[in-house]
Amino acid sequence: IGGALRHVSFDATPGTMNCANFPASVSTAPVQAMEISLYPTYNVLSKMIFSDTKMREDIMCIGGTSQWPATIFRGTDQWGDPFGYLLVDPIGGAIGAFSDGDGISTGGQSRTPICKLPNIEHTEQTFPLLFLYRKEVIDSGGAGKFRGGMSAESCFIPHGTENITHDTLSSGNAIPTSTGMMGGYPGAVNVYKFQRESNIGEMFNKSTLPADIAEVGGREEILGLRQQNFNQKASDVYSVLWTGAGGFGDPLERDPVLVAFDVTENMAVSIQAAKQIYGVVMANDGTCDVNATQALRSQLHQERMKHPRGENAPALRQLSGKKLQQPTANLCVRLDSEAPPNERKRWSCVSCATDLGSVKENYKHGCALQTLPITASNPHVGDYLRYIDDEPVFRQFFCPGCGRLIENEIARFDDELLVDIELKN
């Protein structure tokens, strides 16, 4: 009852980030250390239960504002009284994709059913703020056969007061924390944006409202993730975008009609992402160009197969033995009657049965590997050097026989290939 998570006990190790010893700082634990422990557990549990065809219906990728970008501000309100507020808007997190359907955009926090996104008018009535917009953000949901839910962005200026004083408090801004699963891409990262001395007053005089902070002129200021006591004046524009949700499965397997609908109706996918990530070519009338899409996807599959494999990768061949198990949507275990007795259980592609190596080894060594900059993981991922020193990369593992995307991973450049699946003999 209640899903797999209720049957899991967390036994944290003292002295670690999620079980800190005194006098370590723990003020952000509820929205950061807790979430960075809890949400990856969803993916672990999902991979554990995928082999069961009934239980896989409960699989859900990471979402729900996987790292909360807090905006804390204070000052004197429109009535001359002191005020303080924590912007609660990121509670409208994105729900991750499922094994058989898309995630839910701004669906709330997946760990609780009682999330309520604040009403903008009520916030403006209570505090000295004027919202320029609050919107769901295109491309913020992780790409996949089933797309992750979109997150949102809130943008405001002071109103009825000369200035307000801010603190930022966040993580998850350099690399995605809402990772996808079984070939799905991650969702957007947290993003703080701040335009000093903008032309927002001139825009108001022309009866113009910006649809995005990028349309506002001014001087861009990069905010730190623990920046304290910075002032926002009436001409300064502030926005915060929170994490999107992870996608499920290979984006090239998504129905092109759904991708076209995401572009034209849902405003969930940009034309550029549709082509570059989903391999879908849009026609001038807003529909999918079927022939061009088929040609592009075929080309992308061919390019995937050309990437190098590991030094110890098995010979390129298809297995004809019995299918024993399917641990993920893209990976299965087959018998190889020609192999030595202790090597007969082999990883293979679920589509073409290409041999990916012994189940005693990491299947990723048998895949074609492409290592990309972290910015390739989601269109909203920016320059990591703003926040961290080690270079993160986006690794993709393809079937060398058919080009199917088996899995993605985010790691530091020098990290060994991550082991995400082991079978108990």
Where are these regions (language model features)?
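Conserved beta-strand elements of beta-rich interaction domains across eukaryotes
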Residues: G15, A245, A353-T354, F413
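Short, flexible, mixed-charge glycine/proline-rich loop motifs
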Residues: L324-S348, R386-V393
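Glycine/proline-enriched, intrinsically flexible loops and inter-domain linkers
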Residues: I1-R317
